[in-house]
Amino acid sequence: QAQMSAKGIPQIAVVMGSCTAGGAYVPAMSDVTIIVKEQGTIFLAGPPLVKAATGEIVSAENLGGGEVHTRLSGVADYLAEDDPHALALARRAVASLNWDGGGVNHAVRASMAASYDEPLYDAAELLGIVPADTRQPYDIREVIMRVVDGSRFDEFKPRFGVTLVTGFAHLKGCPIG
């Protein structure tokens, strides 16, 4: 993992079962980690070892399931409903990498940016979304949807650190995020 990361090779982990002991490091060190709800688990030691060491009885889901790793620890970036959803999220992650492996030249990239979809929501609505009082909260996603191409925004880690919004989109055909 570390060597591939050092070479700039993106790593995407999809956890559809149990990642235990050394295998738990793979999703933790990946650039994007997707875990399947009530199916995928990530932990260094499973429930039997926890019981043997501490006497505590804990389920695999409560010890290292999707809820734990997408809301509390932040180890996983996306929570998938099932295996097909996990694979769809993985495909979306690949599409948003903005990594061409050296295969796309700048002329091709420029022509790709020449065409784009206008936002689905009117930018004039921004005045009604962003309050004049800078201390008053508002949903930044509403602003993003009125600025980015096709109002498409792929939020990264949507369940972790909910006061912070990060993600990927396109602006006039150019990838941002």
Predicted regions mapped to residue ranges:
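Terminal amphipathic helices with adjacent charged low-complexity linkers/tails
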Residues: 78-144
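Residue-level detector of functional hotspots within protein domains
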Residues: 18, 61-64, 112-115, 133, ...
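Generic preference for well-ordered secondary structure
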Residues: 11, 47, 53-57, 74, ...
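Generic detector of short, locally flexible boundary/turn motifs and exposed helical patches
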Residues: 1, 35-36, 42-45, 131-136, ...
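Proteins with a high burden of low-complexity, intrinsically disordered sequence enriched in S/T/G/P/A and R
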Residues: 1-2, 104-115, 171-172, 177
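Conserved catalytic cores of soluble enzyme domains
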Residues: 1-102
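Non-catalytic terminal/interface segments that mediate subunit docking, oligomerization
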Residues: 136-177
